[in-house]
A protein has these predicted regions:
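Bacterial Sec-dependent N-terminal signal peptides
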Residues: 1-21
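Extracellular/oxidizing-compartment recognition motifs
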Residues: 20-229, 241, 278-282
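Generic N-terminal helix/loop capping motif
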Residues: 14-16, 218, 252, 269
Length: 465
């Protein structure tokens, strides 16, 4: 009997050790700090400017454009029942909650109304029906809603947050015995971005100034209570988007508490083994998406932490999160081969290797590049913290991996970087070899120039790349 109990004790002890949390009690206080730095949303009432028609136009983006019809006030005084359908334009992209009011014009309302509302960021979204959508992601992400108004007059506020500029309103059902107006349409727009970034100097090319304004507005819309990868879809925090958005914030809005919140959230919701999960879903309560291990995102956390320290000088926070950054380095250490090349096949089995939404992208060279980049940036972080001794192996490992990349991945004749298993020439390979410093400035310039004259180049699939 004693031997059985002893055996059971060993089993349970082993299980407990197996399930042990790498960060222990730190997790709780990290999540508390994440909540502490949750920003207050700034709510601004925005009203539509005009009624528009969406018409086909081969010269416009996605083949549709908006044509002005009348000021918005004309809609508010017009009986709507015979109109049936109308599109309004807010004049700018907004993220927030839409509402409208209805009132009868004359006879008392004797029945309910039903509307279909379609929201679009660009004209084509409200022009092309969603019926042909083949579900890959949830159909519910598409921004259309059927609304029944049981009593008139009434004000209706949609419960879902929307990201849009245009709204198409279609009347699906009404009583033939009374007419009504739609009026007082508005969006309670929200963002946590409260500071006003400096504009580029007037001497800068006007097109660059326009691009900068659009980029800043896009960042503002993504700055909610985390850096969202997109305010329309999928309204969550991804480490890769955090890296880019926080970097932009460092030079524009400079609201570093949002970055701090995201860094703490990701740390607090990391896997029990200490590795970061790529994405956090914030509502109804923050939670990480289980088993979502994304190779380069885990490493980019370290870079974001280093950038945050350089922007803020907040040693306390960064020292608090240093154990997380240090743990992510094991991802490289355990996957680099004796010759200094990353074990691409092994990494693919154990991790999601992303880089871009591009199915035919061969990722061996980008993997080598981002690994070197992350090691370099992590060592800089260690130097800023006075923690070099804790990662004393990094300089030698980095140099070994750089030499391996130049020996095995660089074609001196063409000036381009390619993989060992596939000779595909891609923008991703050149970009990550340049960012990592494997390529010199002259070599980087040559590689990017060569892409313009090389056939069968694998181009970026998305703006993220």
């Amino acid at each position: 009997m004693k031997s059985i109990l002893f055996s059971l004790t060993l089993v349970f002890t082993a299980l407990a050790c197996f399930a042990q949390d790498y960060y222990g009690n730190n997790r709780k206080q990290w999540l508390q700090k994440a909540e502490q730095y949750k920003p207050k949303l700034i709510i601004t009432e925005k009203k539509p400017l005009k009624v528009v028609d969406i018409v086909p136009d081969t010269q416009s983006f996605q083949k549709y454009k908006a044509v002005d019809v009348s000021p918005i006030d004309s809609l508010y005084s017009m009986p709507f029942r015979l109109k049936k359908e109308i599109t309004i334009d807010f004049g700018e992209h907004l993220t927030g909650y839409f509402s409208f009011s209805v009132r009868s014009t004359g006879l008392a309302a004797d029945g309910p109304l039903r509307f279909k509302l379609t929201f679009g960021e660009v004209p084509s979204e409200v022009a092309v029906p969603f019926d042909s959508y083949k579900e890959g992601l949830s159909r519910a992400w598409l921004q259309d809603e059927v609304v029944s108004v049981m009593y008139v007059p009434q004000t209706v506020t949609l419960s879902r947050r929307l990201a849009f500029r245009y709204v198409k309103i279609e009347l699906l059902g009404s009583s033939p015995y009374y007419d009504f107006n739609i009026h007082d349409m508005k969006c309670m727009a929200q963002t946590s971005a409260k500071n006003i970034p400096e504009e580029l100097p007037q001497a800068v090319d006007p097109m660059i100034r326009k691009i900068d304004r659009v980029g800043l507005n896009t960042l503002k819309e993504c700055m909610q209570t985390v850096y969202e990868d997109g305010p329309k879809r999928d309204q969550r925090l991804w480490i890769g988007d955090l890296y880019l958005e926080a970097l932009g914030n460092n030079y524009s809005y400079k609201q570093h508490d949002l970055t701090k919140r995201c860094l703490y959230l990701l740390a607090g919701l990391s896997d029990l083994n200490g590795y970061l999960l790529a994405t956090v879903i914030e509502n109804p309560v923050p939670r990480a998406q289980d088993k979502q291990f994304l190779y380069e995102y885990a490493l980019l956390y370290n870079v974001t932490l280093k950038d945050y320290l350089e922007a803020t000088g907040d040693m306390e926070t960064v020292k608090d999160l240093w154990p997380v950054a240090k743990k992510q380095l094991d991802i490289v250490r355990t996957n680099v081969k004796a010759d200094g090349l990353m074990d691409f096949e092994k990494v693919k089995k154990d991790w999601w290797v992303f880089f871009d939404w591009k199915e035919d992208l061969y990722k061996e060279a980008p993997l080598q590049g981002v690994s070197i980049f992350a090691l370099k940036e992590s060592y800089k972080l260690a130097q800023l913290l006075g923690k070099e001794k804790e990662v004393a192996d990094l300089p030698a490992l980095t140099n070994k991996m750089i030499k391996a990349a130049r020996k095995n991945l660089y074609n001196r004749k063409t000036g381009l970087f390619v993989g060992t298993g596939d000779k595909q020439i891609s923008y991703a390979s050149q970009i990550w070899m340049i960012l990592s410093g494997v390529a010199s400035k002259a070599e980087g310039k040559k590689a990017l120039s060569a892409l313009d004259t090389t056939q069968n180049v694998c181009y970026p699939g998305t703006p993220y790349m």
